[in-house]
Amino acid sequence: MLATIFLTVFIDLLGVGIIIPVLAPLFLNPMSGILPVDYQSAILTRQLLLGLLISVYPMAQFFGAPILGAMSDRFGRKKILILSLVGTCIGYLFFGAGIAAASLITLFISRAIDGFTGGNISIALSAIADISDPKEKAKNFGLIGMAFGLGFILGPYIGGKLADPSVVGWFTHSTPFWFAAALTFLNIILVTFRFPETLKNRVQTRISALTGFRNIAKAFRMPNLRTMFLVVFFLTIGFNFFTQFFQVYLIEKFQFTTGNIGDLFAYIGLWIAFGQGVVTRIASKKFKPQQILSVSCVMLSASLLALLIPDKSWMLLIVLPFVAISNGLTQPNSTAMISNLSSKESQGEVLGINQSIQSLGMAIPPIIAGIISTIDRILPIFMASCFVFLAWVIFLAFYSNRKQEVFQ
């Protein structure tokens, strides 16, 4: 059963990884043709539009993911996962068409569709929570991270090549999105015929378009969870300052091409897969999630700051493994802690709340980064380190006040 969930998530994240090398060059390269001529000389306008486009997905996910999470508690994981994948497939098709037609509005609509239906990962996490005992959750959630890493090994590499006309003459910036849509369609078939229904006891949870806002309010009314939700919020803001605008940093400082970005993110994905698939599984046998998190957060903050040191692109290859492995430890263990502090019947709802918080945390950085990166290209990465460090401080304050055993 875990193997099927792993393969489903891997194919989904392969599609996500494919588009990583495309967005920044699409907006920052004046020759891409996606922006009108009068925008080409205004770097602030181009970077702000890039930031706004990136933020559309998580903002739409903020509204959609908790609805899908609640629906999965009511109707089962499988049906809602299929619905989510159909929306993702449509989103990719619209985005490819938007690039081909040089239509900004189509690009924004496509990301909104994909974001609103983008509950794939939270539903997969709920499925794993359904079949895992508390001691196995961090290890099994690490499988999601390993699938994430493997998707990011192959995805960016494939995306960089599919957008490069020097590889094949008819390749354009649209090609990776057509390919991602085809992959998602294959995933729909896989889930339909191979994904088992894991939810045994269905509950009548409330479904509303305002669930995202209610989730934020509800998160801070949960004594056992509110501090961990705050930690996750700042961790998400911090890491997304890095992931969403690191491409801009690479283009401006090291003159990276789409292919270069794809290759480097494939390298990052290799280390993420190693961190979550190997290091997390070993660490979870010897340490509790809160012990791992207390070390991985400060390690992540320090390694993000260290990214500003290299003045040669090859030097990034030394620093990035520390970023990837520390993030690989942080993600599954923070999710495991939140899951362990929740009842088995509320896993879908609580992980949906967690997804709302992460979506909000993902929506904030690109808009701010689009502005501050025009002041200095290092600022988004510096902000990434600061927010992760803040999350670590809050977590330490939380853990030091919880002497009793609350994490199973």
Feature map (PLM): residue ranges:
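Hydrophobic core of transmembrane alpha-helices in multi-pass small-molecule transporters
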Residues: 10, 91, 103-119, 315-329
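C-terminal transmembrane helical hairpin of 12-TM major facilitator-type secondary transporters
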Residues: 290-334
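Cytoplasmic helix-loop-helix junction between adjacent transmembrane helices
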Residues: 108-147
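Short amphipathic helix-loop junctions that connect adjacent transmembrane helices
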Residues: 21-47, 244-261
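Juxtamembrane intracellular "pre-TM" segments in multi-pass secondary transporters
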Residues: 196-230
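C-terminal membrane-cytosol helix-exit motif in multi-pass small-molecule transporters
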Residues: 182-201, 394-399
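C-terminal ends and interior cores of transmembrane alpha-helices
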Residues: 86-101, 298-311
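Helix-to-loop junctions at the C-terminal end of transmembrane segments
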Residues: 65-76, 163, 275-289, 373
